[in-house]
Amino acid sequence: MSDLHNESIFITGGGSGLGLALVERFIEEGAQVATLELSAAKVASLRQRFGEHILAVEGNVTCYADYQRAVNQILTRSGKLDCFIGNAGIWDHNASLVNTPAETLETGFHELFNVNVLGYLLGAKACAPALIASEGSMIFTLSNAAWYPGGGGPLYTASKHAATGLIRQLAYELAPKVRVNGVGPCGMASDLRGPQALGQSETSIMQSLTPEKIAAILPLQFFPQPADFTGPYVMLASRRNNRALSGVMINADAGLAIRGIRHVAAGLDL
């Protein structure tokens, strides 16, 4: 039996991409899974697909009242909350400083930071009392843009660097009761969209990047699927497998940090 059996896990943005892969994985691990999802259609799809195994709540991660409503339903259903996974986010499709109009830059900043940073902060606030009571954990989705330039434009990159600071501060404030960590995946097959302020709300990441382009820059030379990144979340959520890690950011970058100067990877001819 998995050590996550009957653990209560709350994931934001569980309707598609990495969020959906996390929902699938934690249900497989025997956890009681809940998600806060903006799209009514995705909420309906989750309920139809997973039935009683999912508590799918329609709501916006930029609204504290929606978080409170979700947490109340989780506590009514499970009687506890063991792990909060802040995952919902948006990308800026590499919108650059020079090519983005000033007024768009300002409105895009507020929209993107509201989702990627404030959304995490509000989720942490709403979940903290229950997680302190259960001595549970928080996990936040980062990105390779939390370590490197070029994983997005200045808006997205700044938001993910801000999230690393949030993780460290919350890990400090909530210790010893709550472990707070992050996972930073690289590019993957997902439906990640952009800010409406930048005209990107209907544009997914795969319309800007191709599988071949993503695989070519990674030393491990493959095109990741969302399920490829769920393992670190499972490990960090596990009380047995993660007793000692807090304030840690796992850089799940398929080897980006070891790219060579002469070649992407030295073993391409092996």
Curated annotation (Swiss-Prot):
Pathway: Aromatic compound metabolism; 3-phenylpropanoate degradation. PROSITE patterns: ADH_SHORT. NAD(+) binds at residues 10-34. The keyword Oxidoreductase applies. Keywords: Aromatic hydrocarbons catabolism, NAD, Oxidoreductase. It catalyses: 3-(cis-5,6-dihydroxycyclohexa-1,3-dien-1-yl)propanoate + NAD(+) = 3-(2,3-dihydroxyphenyl)propanoate + NADH + H(+); (2E)-3-(cis-5,6-dihydroxycyclohexa-1,3-dien-1-yl)prop-2-enoate + NAD(+) = (2E)-3-(2,3-dihydroxyphenyl)prop-2-enoate + NADH + H(+). Substrate binds at residue 143. GO terms for molecular function: 2,3-dihydroxy-2,3-dihydro-phenylpropionate dehydrogenase activity. Its EC number is 1.3.1.87. The active site is at 156 (proton acceptor). GO terms for biological process: 3-phenylpropionate catabolic process. Signal peptide: none annotated. It is an enzyme of class 1 (oxidoreductase). It holds the Pfam family adh_short. It comes from the Bacteria. The keyword Oxidoreductase applies. InterPro entries: BphB-like_SDR, Dihydrodiol_DH_HcaB, NAD(P)-bd_dom_sf, Sc_DH/Rdtase_CS, SDR_fam. Belongs to the short-chain dehydrogenases/reductases (SDR) family. Converts 3-phenylpropionate-dihydrodiol (PP-dihydrodiol) and cinnamic acid-dihydrodiol (CI-dihydrodiol) into 3-(2,3-dihydroxylphenyl)propanoic acid (DHPP) and 2,3-dihydroxicinnamic acid (DHCI), respectively. This is 3-phenylpropionate-dihydrodiol/cinnamic acid-dihydrodiol dehydrogenase.
